[in-house]
Each structure stands twice: as structure tokens, then as C-alpha cells.
């Protein structure tokens, strides 16, 4: 059995803040990631689900408000900014849960004056693998083609399984100081460890949620999110050959819609290890339990896992002192 807790939300409901006055005063000044680590809050099932990610190279610094598109502080032309803003509106109108994320241009990966955009969608019929299209906005029709896909419905033609792994590390210090301080440090260490390897690209990115779990990382094509990473975790994370040493850093798969599914998939990841990325998983969520089938080469397993929800409690969600309720969830 393992306990999990939800990601930060705007405070609501009747969750009780059980901290003493001295603890609350201390928490107003301590970094949010330090508080979260000290509290023992587990990370499983804290990944916000999305249908689509739109990754766009945009020079930092980015806006300090997560609701403001990252390109609004760039030196881009009004035409480019307007097209991307219309893509956001188009995705919303199509009912697509799309997350637009800035990538800091990289000396090794990027083309000066020709920003890259990568669009990722959940693979149809595969809940933890993402397919992709890639565009260059400075090329003829590149901007229009990218925005048509980014702002359109799901399931368009042109998506393929990519050969390049994209590892995003949040370094958005304008939103949260823990993300800036810890994310930049982890990104630097990961880039040094990889050297000239271009089969994995490690990016500094804008906010992807879960500031108190900084440094946070999002890994594609698996769509797996990680938190509280340290430099000693990088050999395991980058090689992907084992899971156990960093399993307690796992936040969940952003392609799964419910916290119950994320908690169950996390338990399956612990049991099956890295091979789970190639599995076909089918979930059926009922009141109080989840049925799941696991199909791998030579393996056809079925499980029923019980879901236990605990009482909400308050946590410090970010370095600005915002508090929000989280609800523990266990599976067995």
C-alpha cells in the first residue's frame, strides 16, 4: 500500500490546517520544496492530466504569472504572438486540455532565429506514450502549420512516435523561486552528464505545476512526471534502466485522467519497472477500486486494486506562501 496526495489547487473546502502558529510562521519563510520534503508528502498522483503539450522555444525570462503565455514578454512579432494566442483559444474551443510550455533555447539543440515548436499528444489507445510533430516557426508556413495543429482537435494526421527523448526540467524562477534555484542546478548537471548525446534533449522549461516538488521534470515520450530530484538521481533517470532507486520521486503519468489511475499506474511501475512503458494498460475506475489489465509481450495480467481516500489536509503549495488542500489516496 502506498499513500499519495494531490497537486496544489486554489484553497477550498473544509480541509483543516493542523499546523501550530509557530509552524505556520516558519513555513511562510521556508522554501516550499523544503517544507514538502520535511512533511513526508508522497508524490504519486500529483501530475495534472493533459491531452496535448505544445512546447515552444522562447527566450527567458518568462512572465511571472502562469496564466500569461510565455511569449508575451518575448521580442516576437505581433503576428507570431497573435497566431499562438489564437492557437490557445482554438484548443480551448475544441475541448482539448492543452498545456503550452516555453523551452529555453539551447546552444546545442536550437537554431538561432528559427524557434522550434514540438506538439505532443497522447497516443490513441496507449495511455502512457505520446506521439509528436515538430515545426520551425521561422520557416515558410511553419508558424501557420504549427498553430493549426496546436489549436485544432485531437487525432489530426501527421503525428508519429519520436526517436528523440525530451526531458523538461522546470526552471521558471519568475513563478517560484524553488523551481528557479533547484531546476537550473539540476538542468546544468543533466546537460553535463549527457555531454554531446542528442538522443535525449534536456530543456529548461516554464512552469509545469507542483512547485513544492521542485525540481520537477517531465519526460517524453512516456509523459511521466518526477519531483524532488537530486543530482544523484540523474544516472538512473537518464539511462531509464531501472526504477526502484527513484520510484518515490514519481508523480504520475500526465496521460492518465484520474488520480486513482495515476496511483495504480505508479504501483505497476514499481512492479514491472521500465518495461511498463511498452505495455497496453486498460483501466476501469469504479467507486472504491480500479480494474486494470497489463498486456506486454508474453504477459497478460489483470488486477483489481482498492482505492482508499483519506482526509484532506493543508500544505504550503509554493514559495509565495499559498496554502491548499491535498487529499491522501492509497491503493492496495
Give residue ranges: language-model regions.
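Histidine/cysteine-enriched polar flanking segments
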Residues: 2-3, 7-332
